[in-house]
């Protein structure tokens, strides 16, 4: 057999041209220990803080501790079958969750996966859970209200769009009830709502979802559930996931409201993770960065200006501002607001609504303590008519509390003091409100007008509730057009004052209660 050198060279060239090798560079590591949802990994030299690490079985862990010779990561989900020696690898991505209008009306877990049995979610994309908050230049001052429908809140501690208003109190004082009613009151306001349940019983979350559905508010709400049975990692990340879903609406020139229920349990979950990662404990065994845990979350709630929205949407949305309003909830122990986490969150937020167990147990619900409840920026966002008429309420209550304490020791009181005590009792009675009965701006205005201009003076204390019910019924039935107009504008002038006066005069002359 004779070999032709030309044929051989052609054959070699052909084979070289056809040769195709696929090389893949992967940053891999090996699990060296697994305990309590924390894995230690040898290798992964290029891993980033907060990066997702791919585990066997289509699961992920988040890198939190970057040490000299190992990486500490927290597993997102079940970890019982993970074992020493298993191979893991970097993904080059941080945690992202689905965002978009398709999530409205759905119940999802921390990772944005549906858990309500209603099928897949059509999302508009993904967003990182950790995002830097808008800068000072991108923000706009708070000057539009978020109506909660509660007389005590909207009159004394008003909330504005883009504000962070803390709801704080002991367990069983009506914190969740207040937040849920605020969500229900937004069903026709155009404000999208996100409810983040952290560390609660699954039955409690199911009850909240049912109540939202019954009152027609679920279609406008995303529920993010990280129940007590979920891992500490998912409870720690749930607020950030919910915030990313809310930012989708804010950045497109819309308004959103997010409730974190509650951040005390998130701090406990983060403390658990930090201690398992062997980070040094500080006050109350919390890690040193627990303040940053909440500040970086709550700073993302803001009102952004038109330029920010236009730049974000690449010119698709013009002339619109967006907002994300946050209602974080903190549970105190025996009314101690000077504990570590409560003081942190009070210092971060723009005000707090303090709910007191003594008031709650004495039948004053919502149990708002007007003495230490405050809204630092909401006053500029308050509806004109409510702002004008609510001025005397806080003063009346403050004077009443002071006199009531003094009256316990005094045997006989002069007429002026007795009159002031009677007025304070009636105002306190009038501010009581049942759950799931939010009031419109016009309804609140009529009630506040009655307080401000002495229409309650001749009404017995025991008849205040029936007086209020009859007054609202009379106003809505006989002056529906005026009430609708007042709800729309929220203005207050001499003409509106005269109309309100004629409504009250007509009611007292012709109605029985």
Curated annotation (Swiss-Prot):
The lineage of its organism: Bacteria, Pseudomonadati, Pseudomonadota, Gammaproteobacteria, Pasteurellales. It catalyses: ATP + H2O + 4 H(+)(in) = ADP + phosphate + 5 H(+)(out). Belongs to the ATPase alpha/beta chains family. Its main location: membrane. PROSITE patterns: ATPASE_ALPHA_BETA. This is ATP synthase subunit alpha. Keywords: ATP synthesis, ATP-binding, Cell inner membrane, Cell membrane, CF(1), Hydrogen ion transport, Ion transport, Membrane, Nucleotide-binding, Translocase, Transport. One of its GO terms (cellular component) is proton-transporting ATP synthase complex. InterPro entries: ATP_synth_asu-like_sf, ATP_synth_asu_C, ATP_synth_asu_C_sf, ATP_synth_F1_a_nt-bd_dom, ATP_synth_F1_asu, ATPase_a/bsu_AS, ATPase_F1/V1/A1_a/bsu_N, ATPase_F1/V1/A1_a/bsu_N_sf. CDD domains: ATP-synt_F1_alpha_C, ATP-synt_F1_alpha_N, F1-ATPase_alpha_CD. It is an enzyme of class 7 (translocase). It comes from the Bacteria. ATP binds at residues 169-176. SUPFAM superfamilies: C-terminal domain of alpha and beta subunits of F1 ATP synthase (SSF47917), N-terminal domain of alpha and beta subunits of F1 ATP synthase (SSF50615), P-loop containing nucleoside triphosphate hydrolases (SSF52540). Produces ATP from ADP in the presence of a proton gradient across the membrane. The alpha chain is a regulatory subunit. It is a peripheral membrane protein. Pfam families: ATP-synt_ab, ATP-synt_ab_C, ATP-synt_ab_N. The record marks 373 as: Required for activity. It is found in: Cell inner membrane. The keyword Transmembrane helix does not apply. One of its GO terms (biological process) is proton motive force-driven ATP synthesis. The gene is atpA. GO terms for molecular function: ADP binding; ATP binding; proton-transporting ATP synthase activity, rotational mechanism.
